[in-house]
Amino acid sequence: MEYTPSPKPQLSSRANAFSIAALMSSGTPKDKEAQESTIKPLEQFVEKSSCSQPIGDISIVDSHGEFTNSPSSLCTEPLIPTTPIIPSEEMAKISCSLETKELWDKFHDLGTEMIITKSGRRMFPTIRVSFSGVDADAKYIVLMDIVPVDNKRYRYAYHRSAWLVAGKADPPLPARLYVHPDSPFTGEQLLKQMVSFEKVKLTNNELDQHGHIILNSMHKYQPRVHIIKKKDHTASLLNLKSEEFRTFIFQETVFTAVTAYQNQLITKLKIDSNPFAKGFRDSSRLTDIERESVESLIQKHSYARSPIRTYGGDEDVLSEDGQVVQCRGSAFTTSDNLSLSSWVSSTSGFSGFQHPQSLTALGTSTASLATPIPHPIQGSLPPYSRLGMPLTPSALASSMQGSGPTFPSFHMPRYHHYFQQGPYAAIQGLRHSSTVMTPFV
């Protein structure tokens, strides 16, 4: 029995109007021509405003600072107009040198990477240049831009620790010029100081409105420094075709834009070289002397604080460090062999409580002031046979009368496990369940 396919369902006129064939054939040639006429100018504008390399022969500074010529590029109209093959005599005398060349060479040997973020990230190393051969009486404008090195996209191969070509580059983004905020400079200023582009920020936000330089991630870029001789009619930098300028390129400043560092050696070198990356340095980078001082400082502050320790003990660290450490040790290690009266006397330095009026008898010398003074209420507490007995106002009032209480001798138990719990928990453990606390005002 032969199979006969069922006939295709027929669409209604309304449904047929929204079919794929009807939608594809609905556009007229006139509409397509009008659409192309509006898109082509935009594409041409993007291509012209984001040229990968300057056209023609521009001045390139090699490692020795000599003037050379670069081969012509395929771009027809770059953002920065072409410098003449032979610059004017005045501009030809100007030379530019990279101040941080040694640091750039270290990064260049590993493959420099620059972080780009949505909000913008500053460059490190920073491009710092100095000029010579300028006219001291003239005014100059210094600016910088960053252009793609090639039309390729890269990826980092971790097993080879190298950058490999991953494909064709993404569509170029609009190029931007960064004019140094201190421009225009006088020639005298350029001869005495260097120009630092430390405020340049790199971003991957195509809608950025803060003047940051927009880059694509995983693409290689080349920074360029331009110097323009300012004339009287130079009002803006929108059109540089009529200006006299010079471009300088340093090959060691080529970098790859990334959203996260790929090479761990680059990360380590940036942490070691960047003074603003101190937060990423761990304690293992300390020297032996610094490590010993830190360890001794930690040991001095690692003792357990007694919840019933008298006031004024912190001042002992400045006066007699050895005596204070000994007092603290006696409070925690030999308390079982001391009575409460002798223990309080050894820790406070007083046999009994001294009223504030009687402090004049101590004198005003520095030695007497360095002696720890117990807290009035804390030093006057009566030594009951049990620390858990209620401290009523009447008992406190009776203890405050007279020149000072007399402490009966009795054996003091160990409180090591209470002190390890912290001051508040230790007091709660020492206090009897029926204790009534009276607030001191």
From Swiss-Prot:
<dbReference type="GO" id="GO:0007507">
    <property type="term" value="P:heart development"/>
</dbReference>
<dbReference type="InterPro" id="IPR036960">
    <property type="entry name" value="T-box_sf"/>
</dbReference>
<dbReference type="GO" id="GO:0000578">
    <property type="term" value="P:embryonic axis specification"/>
</dbReference>
<dbReference type="GO" id="GO:0000981">
    <property type="term" value="F:DNA-binding transcription factor activity, RNA polymerase II-specific"/>
</dbReference>
<feature type="DNA-binding region" description="T-box">
    <location>
        <begin position="103"/>
        <end position="282"/>
    </location>
</feature>
<comment type="function">
    <text>Transcriptional regulator that may be involved in heart developmental processes.</text>
</comment>
<dbReference type="GO" id="GO:0005634">
    <property type="term" value="C:nucleus"/>
</dbReference>
<dbReference type="Pfam" id="PF00907">
    <property type="entry name" value="T-box"/>
</dbReference>
<dbReference type="InterPro" id="IPR046360">
    <property type="entry name" value="T-box_DNA-bd"/>
</dbReference>
<keyword id="KW-0217">Developmental protein</keyword>
<dbReference type="GO" id="GO:0000785">
    <property type="term" value="C:chromatin"/>
</dbReference>
<keyword id="KW-0539">Nucleus</keyword>
<keyword id="KW-0805">Transcription regulation</keyword>
<dbReference type="GO" id="GO:0000978">
    <property type="term" value="F:RNA polymerase II cis-regulatory region sequence-specific DNA binding"/>
</dbReference>
<keyword id="KW-0238">DNA-binding</keyword>
<dbReference type="GO" id="GO:0045893">
    <property type="term" value="P:positive regulation of DNA-templated transcription"/>
</dbReference>
<dbReference type="GO" id="GO:0006357">
    <property type="term" value="P:regulation of transcription by RNA polymerase II"/>
</dbReference>
<dbReference type="GO" id="GO:0001706">
    <property type="term" value="P:endoderm formation"/>
</dbReference>
<dbReference type="GO" id="GO:0001708">
    <property type="term" value="P:cell fate specification"/>
</dbReference>
<keyword id="KW-0804">Transcription</keyword>
<protein>
    <recommendedName>
        <fullName>T-box transcription factor TBX20</fullName>
    </recommendedName>
</protein>
<dbReference type="InterPro" id="IPR018186">
    <property type="entry name" value="TF_T-box_CS"/>
</dbReference>
<dbReference type="InterPro" id="IPR008967">
    <property type="entry name" value="p53-like_TF_DNA-bd_sf"/>
</dbReference>
<dbReference type="GO" id="GO:0048370">
    <property type="term" value="P:lateral mesoderm formation"/>
</dbReference>
<dbReference type="InterPro" id="IPR001699">
    <property type="entry name" value="TF_T-box"/>
</dbReference>
